[in-house]
């Protein structure tokens, strides 16, 4: 009881959420550093731009429209007309400022090539992509039908991203995350019971299982030899 410790209040806070992709059950959630200090739950309330983490949903839409992992796409400079993005003239770049020329769709995702993601979106159409991402639970209001959608310029919450990626993880079914399994009184009688959407039972199949499988395999390569190789330090083989 005589021990002392120093606690430093963070200037920047993060969030964490874990969801069972087969029924939407929220296994764990951390909304911030200290709930007593700040009631703002970053998992459910923090709307942020997802950036490149949104690209797999655009790639998935591309697969649905006829692209394959071996499709050749040009990673080359591009000038976008203002009307296509709802703003000013746009000359998108890759993160490193370099261009790789013709490459496969698989290679482009592994290296997170912005120009390839944009060209995929141009080929399938922004209206179609906006409709398609709704299959993962994303709303059209937060993701305007502009080419900037290819780079994750919309708005999502961490819980929304977990919900979206669950579709890939469970083989193509959409499940709605839930917090409470059931409510019981002091005698153990169930007053309320959640009826979750369960994969293989009542969950809606929103994308082709083959699409989900291919996307998962492509995302695994991002860890094996792409922009997320640091994740290999965890020593796991199931990460994507």
Residue ranges and their predicted role:
Residues 1-48, 52-56, 70-71, 127-134, ...:
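Periplasmic/cell-envelope proteins involved in peptidoglycan metabolism and beta-lactam response
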Residues 1-18, 29, 36-40, 107, ...:
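A penicillin-recognizing enzyme superfamily signal
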Residues 17-18, 27-29, 71-74, 107, ...:
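Structural recognition of the beta-strand scaffold that forms the well-ordered cores
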Residues 22, 67-129, 174, 186-214, ...:
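Conserved catalytic neighborhood of penicillin-recognizing serine enzymes
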Residues 23-25, 33-37, 49, 78-81, ...:
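Solvent-exposed loop/turn segments at secondary-structure junctions
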Residues 23-24, 44-75, 108, 164-168, ...:
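Active-site SXXK
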Residues 87-94, 125-163:
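Mid-domain, small-residue-enriched loop/turn segments at the edges of structured enzyme/sensor domains
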Residues 121-124, 131-136, 143-146, 176-181, ...:
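Short coil/turn segments at secondary-structure boundaries
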